[in-house]
Amino acid sequence: MKSIVSILLFCALAVVIMGHRLNQGYGIPHDVVKLPNGQWCKTPGDDCSQSSECCKAKDTVTYSSGCSQQWSGQQGGFVNLCRICNVESSMC
């Protein structure tokens, strides 16, 4: 019984950490600019349909930005989210 509770607690903690907004690069410095269509660019973690909607990282050599598909446990499927990540990371 104790091991089952430990496994469930670990799984719940993993879901909370992996689903956190900072995992999309929200803490990485980025430029919030007005797009040609008059709207502001979308910050990391926001829904998107194409990469041109997403805000770009200030350091474009180290970081890459764009719209990527990620699993959402809350919505029960894949969603497109703006994301900024380190170019050298295997998660990018």
From Swiss-Prot:
The name this protein goes by in its record: Toxin ICK-17
Task performed by this protein: Probable neurotoxin with ion channel impairing activity.
Keywords: Disulfide bond, Ion channel impairing toxin, Knottin, Neurotoxin, Secreted, Signal, Toxin
Source organism superkingdom: Eukaryota
GO CC term (a single one): extracellular region
Family that this chain belongs to: Belongs to the neurotoxin 21 family.
Any one GO molecular-function label of the UniProt entry: toxin activity
Domain text: The presence of a 'disulfide through disulfide knot' structurally defines this protein as a knottin.
Signal peptide stretch: 1-19
Highest classification ranks of the organism: Eukaryota, Metazoa, Ecdysozoa, Arthropoda, Chelicerata
Main location: secreted
Localization terms from the record: Secreted
tRNA-binding listed as a keyword: no
Disulfide bridge partners, by residue number: C41-C55, C48-C67, C54-C82, C85-C92
Tissue: Expressed by the venom gland.
Pfam families (UniProt xref): Cys_Knot_tox (PF17486)
Keyword Signal: yes
